Amino acid sequence: MPPNAKSETDAKPEAEPAPASEPAADLESVDQKLEETHHSKFREVDRQEQEVLAEKAAEAASQRIAQVESTTRSATTEAQESTTTAVPVIKKIEHVGEVVTEVIAERTGLPTWGVVAIIILVFLVVFGIIFFCVRRFLKKRRTKDGKGKKGVDMKSVQLLGSAYKEKVQPDMEELTENAEEGDEEDKQSEQKLGRLNFKLEYDFNSNSLAVTVIQAEELPALDMGGTSDPYVKVYLLPDKKKKFETKVHRKTLSPVFNETFTFKSLPYADAMNKTLVFAIFDFDRFSKHDQIGEVKVPLCTIDLAQTIEEWRDLVSVEGEGGQEKLGDICFSLRYVPTAGKLTVVILEAKNLKKMDVGGLSDPYVKIAIMQNGKRLKKKKTSIKKCTLNPYYNESFSFEVPFEQIQKICLVVTVVDYDRIGTSEPIGRCILGCMGTGTELRHWSDMLASPRRPIAQWHTLKDPEETDEILKNMK
């Protein structure tokens, strides 16, 4: 054989594997096509699901929009109906008002604006009367409730727990306990005024009653510092002509007085018809003295044949505790020892007793320097017409040597001026050697602070009582 033929035969078996690679490629292409079809099917399913969800969302949104539109339509229709119903009513009221005003204007002859103004004033007056009546009724009701049962007291409120609910709404058991204990606490509060120790000795030979104010204790604190400046007034009821005062004890709630006062010319038969009064006051230089309490001892209830010494609780009083309301006066004192000059400045008076028929007075003030029952010097202020609270601010000077200042008395008298008849004294204050209580304290403060004016309020005393004191100076 030729060599070329041999090569052809050899080359044929080498070219036979080519058909085997063709079916593998076909398989790969088939797999790719299958995958693509699967992916396309999944994509179509996803698209269909998304389209379904979108359609459902669109339907829900359309339903919500329809509901909102229906509610808005109903609201607008209701508003339109209300406005349509309210407008005619308002128009009717306005029409009636115009007709009424025109009728009133025609009958009275006033302009329409005048009629409208009168109607408004009438409505305001009626409304004010109704408001005043309601407020007065509520005020009376509050006062009645305050005087009635006390369900919860301040102590129980303070003892409540830290929980806010307990503070706002306490338990019913606590309320009932407080209601039951209300009377006992009222009694305890009445006993917080303190008590007084005194001694009584009656002398049948001289027909005199010696009263000793020994001490007091557990007095209430009336000053800002938690203390008081107590003093005691002693007098007999019903005449009240003779009154005595103890010294003022500064900043104490348990003062010790140990002062004795004697009521002379008091027969035993007359003493049985009288009541001995101990009135305790808190001294205040610049305002009216506050009464702490009092002790009343009817002499017919005790045995005057023996010496009596006892403690008694103070009782609260309304008003002045038997003291006449003559008024108060404020004046200042200044003494210069080197020059022997006493200056009295009458500042003002207040709440004076009504002396005239019209319920007023024409007050002026007389100032007198007295020694041994004799009047050495006198001066007086101007007259203030028709007033119970006169203001003077008038200064007066007296020459009083230092050797004589301890022997004189300064008598300040408020007098009601009368053009026709005699002028009547309203009340009086006595300072100096015969002064007692607050008057003596004022005089002592003046001497202790030379060259400096000392101002103080004083309660006016009965002129008849002070006349007896001045007579005893002789």
From Swiss-Prot:
Concerning SMART domains, the annotation shows: C2
The residues listed in the UniProt record as binding Ca(2+) 1, with positions renumbered to this chain, are 223, 229, 282-284
Q: Residue ranges, Cytoplasmic compartment?
A: 135-474
Residues noted as binding Ca(2+) 4 in the record, renumbered to the chain: 356, 362, 416, 418
Please list the residue ranges that the record marks as compositionally biased, kind Basic and acidic residues: 30-49
Cofactor, free-text remark? Binds 3 Ca(2+) ions per subunit. The ions are bound to the C2 domains.
Spell out the Acidic residues composition-biased ranges. 171-187
Top-level division of the source organism's lineage: Eukaryota
What result is annotated for mutating residue 383 to V?
A: In RNA edited version
Q: Which GO terms describe its molecular function?
A: calcium ion binding; calcium ion sensor activity; calcium-dependent phospholipid binding; phosphatidylserine binding; protein homodimerization activity; SNARE binding
InterPro entries in UniProt? C2_dom, C2_domain_sf, Synaptotagmin
Membrane spanning stretches: 108-134
Q: Where is the segment annotated Phospholipid binding?
A: 186-434
Compositionally biased, Low complexity: which spans? 69-84
What are the C2 domain coordinates in residue numbering? 192-312, 325-458
**Which SUPFAM superfamilies does this UniProt record tie to the protein?**
C2 domain (Calcium/lipid-binding domain, CaLB)
| Primary site of residence | membrane
To which protein family does this belong? Belongs to the synaptotagmin family.
Protein name in UniProt: Synaptotagmin 1
What species does this protein belong to? Answer: Drosophila melanogaster
